[in-house]
């Protein structure tokens, strides 16, 4: 759906006998929450929306019950609707055989920790000396936006954060991530892993540093629709989402390499979406090549990169040092851009496997995955 949908009321063909004592007026006043409704197939989504619109704001589940829904977004490439409805109505809707799941549109946050190097450690300058700087490679930064900065060349983007139409960064996190990927090779500031890569600011997190699954899924959809080669997701949630997994899978099927932060709780399992099979999960290391104490690890961890005291661009044409797997992830996204420039015909899967195969082993795969990303070895 290419434009926002107004407030409407959904109906289903099911006849459900559920006691319903509230009036229509009181039902309309019930507090609604955001949900994601997954359907078994795309055609079912269209039929559901058509039925809703034809029902003229009256959803009749049975003689006793009506359900009011506000449609927020219909995804183009996955069979999912973003909606608002009363939690009390979820169980009734889930009985529709066309609906495969209904899940909360959960909050997702940045993976930065506190106020905190790594380009030389991943040996990016050696690749630069070979003429590999990420030229012609499109990298989408799904984050808090990217602020205008003399050390960054932002080529475009889009915002999927309600109430924040600008892609400018009101938080700082996204600007910092962008600099690690592609800070310019000029006379000022810092140097990125892929200084000639094309940066796209895809705003999916608000100024508070948090956002929703639906915003991130829309950002991934945008990345697929706009020919992005790499998508950096320095964000995550402890909770799985079927919608987010579908969005990752869809973007991957359209050629996007999805690179995501493993998480900052220090736990022995990684966060979502990094845990999904089609996302490249990145953990963080310190200056001694040890796992950063906060870096989540475990099954599914693909690779690690510097994530402690990482200096990069920041809003206000300034620079800052930050810690987090959020800071590690863009090192890998930048390295992917270098590999893509050298091997333009390679698929996202080939690039991912090559980065893992050329990483510097640091020990246990449980703690470090394939090892420390090595831009020099990856671009030989």
Swiss-Prot record:
Transmembrane segments: none annotated. It is found in: Secreted. Binds 2 calcium ions per subunit. The lineage of its organism: Bacteria, Bacillati, Bacillota, Bacilli, Bacillales. Its EC number is 3.4.21.-. Its cofactor is Ca(2+). PANTHER family: CEREVISIN-RELATED (PTHR43806:SF11), PEPTIDASE S8 (PTHR43806). This is Alkaline protease. InterPro entries: Peptidase_S8/S53_dom, Peptidase_S8/S53_dom_sf, Peptidase_S8_Asp-AS, Peptidase_S8_His-AS, Peptidase_S8_Ser-AS, Peptidase_S8_subtilisin-like, Peptidase_S8_subtilisin-rel, S8pro/Inhibitor_I9. Gene3D superfamilies: Peptidase S8 propeptide/proteinase inhibitor I9 (3.30.70.80), Peptidase S8/S53 domain (3.40.50.200). Pfam families: Inhibitor_I9, Peptidase_S8.
